[in-house]
Swiss-Prot record:
GO biological process per UniProt: 'de novo' CTP biosynthetic process; pyrimidine nucleobase biosynthetic process
NCBIfam families: PRK05380.1, PyrG
Keywords: ATP-binding, Glutamine amidotransferase, Ligase, Nucleotide-binding, Pyrimidine biosynthesis
Start and end residues of each Glutamine amidotransferase type-1 domain: 305-559
Listed CDD domains: CTPS_N, GATase1_CTP_Synthase
Protein name per its UniProtKB record: CTP synthase
Short name of one Pfam family: GATase
Molecular function (Gene Ontology), one example: identical protein binding
Summary of the function given for this chain in its UniProt record: Catalyzes the ATP-dependent amination of UTP to CTP with either L-glutamine or ammonia as the source of nitrogen.
Record-linked InterPro entries: Class_I_gatase-like, CTP_synthase, CTP_synthase_N, GATASE, GATase1_CTP_Synthase, P-loop_NTPase
Species this chain originates from: Candida glabrata (strain ATCC 2001 / BCRC 20586 / JCM 3761 / NBRC 0622 / NRRL Y-65 / CBS 138) (Yeast)
Stated family: Belongs to the CTP synthase family.
Record field: catalytic activity: UTP + L-glutamine + ATP + H2O = CTP + L-glutamate + ADP + phosphate + 2 H(+)
Catalytic residues (positions): C404 (for gatase activity), H535 (for gatase activity), E537 (for gatase activity)
């Protein structure tokens, strides 16, 4: 097993996740099987109860794990399926060690950070790195480990020490370290001092970088690269210029141009790994398709405008998987994506009274959009604005996709304005609401007291109902009888309303294994009015976009029938089939 650690200095949020994912993707183009582990040095057990406005999106895995959004990047770039154990947090590892101490596993010893916690971290990495994550079912060849936060922070100290020990545990030829650092541009001059200081701190902790990935807003000058190499005690070929590009999907090709993969091949002695001709061919096909996809991104001419009506729009990372699913879909449809961010509260009548400019700007975006998306969320704030956007899409035949809360919002709006249930709402927003008006209800099996990990989580099946051959969403899924998608919710559509809703044209075409819980609806006689209780964005891949999102973008571009017919596929020669 080979290990590539990606750490960061100077500041957090510098792009370690994208660089780690891109490095893994390039290793896959060699035919290698790659897995990933993310280390998050916070005390939370997982990301499930964190505010999206503080931490960004909570990414849900097949096994129901609620994790850091970077695991979404790994799954999208590497086309793998990770587990909750691929996300190590301080809370998890401390809980693990304390549980072992309580069981008596340490035989009365004084349990300390070193060696007990650091050993536990190393053992965790070794165990999880061997879990098969792709469709081959075989043990991975390489594990990418991203160390979250900034090296030197007190929170990450135990993990840094564990990795220092780990390099000797696995052997130098099996361990490589890439350190990501910032090269700011001040008054037109590229400054290297922050990188020099970051590498000095890293070396003082016992970790020596094999490569330094320099993040900069512009291409690094040759003299700057040579200066960093000299003062950081590495060769010039070990300094990688990761400047800003049009899209993060170009980063793997940027690294490829700078021969990063050649250096890692030599440094980790990758020639020792036995690969079949099928493995090598699969890697070559991946690189060819990736170039095709990025070519589509660069050559896309027509713009498709999607209004994203949400409640966490102040931090775009709150909807990272949604954004990526839209990007994947737009690249497949050969369209340039324009996301128009709409804060849901700005659509509500109260805003017209207090902030008219915001109100009119928000409605201008909604009314001029090619398609409307209402994503997931929690709480009542902004829900009336979301309902107004849903109604606009329904009545004006604008393509619409609702996800999780979006499905519930669209159903409530339909019940109010089509069924005449004027007081219809969700038990989440108004727990004391009369049962006759509860369009959305609390799921009976869910724990009302415990917040963490208590939702309906993870991969679950959805079955298409009989007589649904007409619906676009089923066709997008290849007319499959059932699909498996990831869930994260506590509330569901009230089964008592389903018959009335369907009588008026809102058809619940997909349900769970009990045939009672509604998973997908689609409206008849509408270009595309679809919503899902599950989160399809979590399984969207760069070369295999999420089907509901693909449907939204295709319908918004006027090419839904062509996409369903398979006329927009990557063929590996830099162009799509269409």
């Amino acid at each position: 097993m080979k290990y590539v650690v990606v750490s960061g200095g100077v500041i957090s949020g510098i792009g370690k996740g994208v660089l780690a994912s891109s490095t893994g993707m390039l290793l896959k183009t060699l035919g290698l099987k790659v897995t990933s582990i993310k280390i998050d040095p916070y005390m939370n057990i997982d990301a499930g109860t964190m505010s999206p406005l503080e931490h960004g999106e909570c990414f849900v895995l097949n096994d129901g794990g609620e994790t850091d959004l970077d695991l979404g990047n790994y799954e999208r770039y590497l086309n793998v399926t990770l587990t909750k154990d691929h996300n190590i947090t301080t809370g998890k590892i401390y809980s693990h060690v304390i549980a072992k101490e309580r069981k008596g596993d340490y035989l009365g010893k004084t349990v300390q950070i070193v060696p007990h916690l650091t050993n536990a971290i190393q053992e965790w990495i070794e165990r999880v790195s061997r879990i098969p994550v792709d469709n081959t079912g075989m043990e991975p060849d390489v594990c990418i480990i991203e160390l979250g936060g900034t090296v030197g922070d007190i929170e990450s100290a135990p993990f840094v020490e564990a990795l220092r020990q780990f390099q000797f545990r696995v052997g130098k030829e099996n361990f490589a370290l890439i350190h990501v650092s910032l090269v700011p541009v001040i008054h037109g001059e590229q400054k290297t001092k922050p990188t020099q200081a970051a590498i000095k701190d890293l070396r003082s902790l016992g970790l020596v970088p094999d490569m330094i990935a320099c993040r900069c807003s512009e291409t690094l000058e040759k003299g700057v690269i040579e200066k960093i190499a000299m003062f950081c005690h590495v060769g010039a070929d070990q300094v990688v210029n990761v400047h800003d590009v049009n899209s993060t999907y170009h980063v793997p090709l940027l690294l490829l141009e700078q021969k990063m993969i050649n250096y890692l091949h030599q440094r980790l002695q990758l020639q020792e790994i036995t690969l079949s001709s099928e493995d090598i061919q699969r890697g070559e096909n991946l690189l060819s398709k990736w170039k095709s996809m990025t070519g589509n991104f660069d050559s896309s001419m027509e713009t498709v405008k999607i209004a994203l009506v949400g409640k966490y729009t102040n931090l775009k990372d709150s909807y990272l998987s949604v954004i990526k699913a839209l990007e994947h879909s737009s690249m497949k449809c050969r369209r340039k994506l324009e996301i128009m961010w709409v804060e849901a509260t700005d659509l509500e009548p109260e805003t017209q009274d207090t902030e008219k400019a915001k109100f009119h700007e928000a409605w201008n975006k909604v009314s001029t959009a090619d398609g409307i998306l209402v994503p997931g969320g929690f709480g009542s704030r902004g829900t009336e604005g979301m309902m107004l956007a849903s109604r606009w899409a329904r009545e004006n035949h604008i393509p619409f996709l609702g996800v999780c809360l979006g499905l519930q919002i669209a159903t409530i709006e339909f019940a109010r304005n089509v069924l005449g249930v004027k007081e219809g709402n969700s038990a989440e927003f108004f727990p004391e609401l009369d049962e006759s008006n509860q369009v959305v209800v609390f799921m009976p099996e869910i724990d009302k007291e415990t917040m963490g990990g208590s939702m309906r989580l993870g991969l679950r099946p959805t079955y298409f109902q009989q007589g649904t051959e007409w619906c676009a969403i089923k066709k997008l899924y290849g007319s499959a009888e059932s699909v498996e998608e990831r869930h994260r919710h506590r509330y569901e559509i009230n089964p008592n309303f389903i018959e009335r809703l369907e009588e008026h044209g809102l058809m619940f075409v997909g349900r769970d294994e009990t045939n009672k819980r509604c998973e997908i609806f689609e409206m008849k006689d509408h270009p595309f009015f679809v919503a899902t209780q599950y989160h399809p964005e979590y399984t969207s891949k760069v070369l295999d976009p999420s089907k509901p999102f693909l449907g939204l973008v295709a319908a918004s571009s006027g090419i839904l029938d062509d996409v369903i017919a398979g006329k927009y596929e990557f063929n590996g020669d830099g162009k799509s089939d269409f």
